[in-house]
């Protein structure tokens, strides 16, 4: 049920004064729907209030713009305005501090959410304990001199190593043959030519072919189980 006309005017007047800004009929009608007021009733109340001098209005073509009477409001002086600006600045500063606090709390929450749960920590602890136990068992076997490498794996590595040594020996011999031929027919000093071409012998870089080749023989002489 719609309010009576006098109640409607009171509602509309209170709304216009609270808003204290230019309003048209549609603005007021949309905002006052919660009071079950129709647009026609709002229009009638606005016109009645304007005729009574309780609000003011201006006409722009066919549209009327209504606004609260400004003489009913206390206008602050320059000192009061300055105080209001100062208070507003303090409030803005407090607002920024609150926003920062909220942001810090949200970051802390995200950080806590990204951490492991108790259940995950327990699972990780159990996994690490298992890995440590396995490593300790391997260490005990090593100390006891037990071979941890399978014989077939050991032989495969030794065969591959021997093949690489043979390739090294062949390439070393090929280089020597080619190098001897080049230096014999070159008028330049061997050392000078070597530096000019950027050639380095194994010995120049701290390598000893024989030392690596001897490892094969040493490996064959080692007793089993070591």
UniProtKB/Swiss-Prot annotation:
Fetch the InterPro entries from UniProt. Answer: Hop2_WH_dom (IPR010776), LZ3wCH (IPR040661), WH-like_DNA-bd_sf (IPR036388), WH_DNA-bd_sf (IPR036390)
**Phenotype of null mutants:** Sterility due to failure of both male and female gametophyte development.
Where is it localised?
Nucleus
Q: Is Protein biosynthesis tagged as a keyword?
A: no
Reported tissue expression = Expressed in vegetative and reproductive tissues. Found in seedlings, leaves and flowers.
What are the record keywords, sorted?
Answer: Coiled coil, DNA recombination, Meiosis, Nucleus
User: What biological process terms from GO does the record include?
Assistant: chiasma assembly
Q: In which broad location class does this protein mainly occur, judging by the first location in its UniProt entry?
A: nucleus
Q: Which SUPFAM superfamilies match?
A: Winged helix' DNA-binding domain
Q: Name one GO cellular component term.
A: nucleus
- Coiled coil location: 76-150
- Top-level taxon in the UniProt lineage: Eukaryota
What family is this?
Answer: Belongs to the HOP2 family.
Q: Which PANTHER family match?
A: HOMOLOGOUS-PAIRING PROTEIN 2 HOMOLOG, TBP-1 INTERACTING PROTEIN
Q: What does this protein do?
A: Involved in bivalent formation and segregation of homologous chromosomes in meiosis.
Q: Quaternary structure per UniProt? A: Interacts with MND1 and MIP1.
Protein name in UniProt: Homologous-pairing protein 2 homolog
In which organism is this protein found?
Answer: Arabidopsis thaliana
């Amino acid at each position: 049920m719609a309010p009576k006309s006098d109640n409607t005017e009171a509602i509309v007047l209170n709304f216009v004064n609270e808003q204290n800004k230019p309003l048209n009929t549609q603005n007021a009608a949309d905002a006052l729907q919660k009071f079950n007021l129709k647009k026609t009733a709002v229009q009638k109340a606005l016109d009645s209030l304007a005729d009574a001098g309780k609000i003011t209005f201006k006409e722009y073509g066919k549209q009327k713009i209504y606004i609260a009477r400004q003489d009913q409001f206390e206008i602050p002086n320059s000192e009061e305005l300055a105080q209001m600006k100062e208070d507003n600045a303090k409030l803005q500063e407090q607002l920024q501090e609150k926003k920062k606090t909220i942001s810090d709390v949200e970051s802390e929450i995200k950080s806590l959410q990204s951490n492991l749960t108790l259940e995950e920590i327990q699972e990780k602890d159990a996994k690490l304990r298992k890995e440590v136990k396995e490593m300790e068992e391997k260490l005990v076997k090593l100390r006891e001199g037990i071979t941890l490498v399978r014989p077939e794996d050991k032989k495969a590595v030794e065969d591959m190593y021997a093949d690489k040594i043979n390739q090294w020996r062949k390439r070393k011999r090929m280089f020597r043959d080619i190098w001897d031929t080049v230096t014999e027919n070159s008028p330049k000093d061997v050392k000078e030519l070597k530096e000019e071409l950027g050639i380095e012998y194994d010995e120049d870089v701290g390598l000893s072919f024989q030392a690596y080749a001897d490892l094969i023989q040493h490996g064959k002489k080692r007793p089993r189980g070591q």
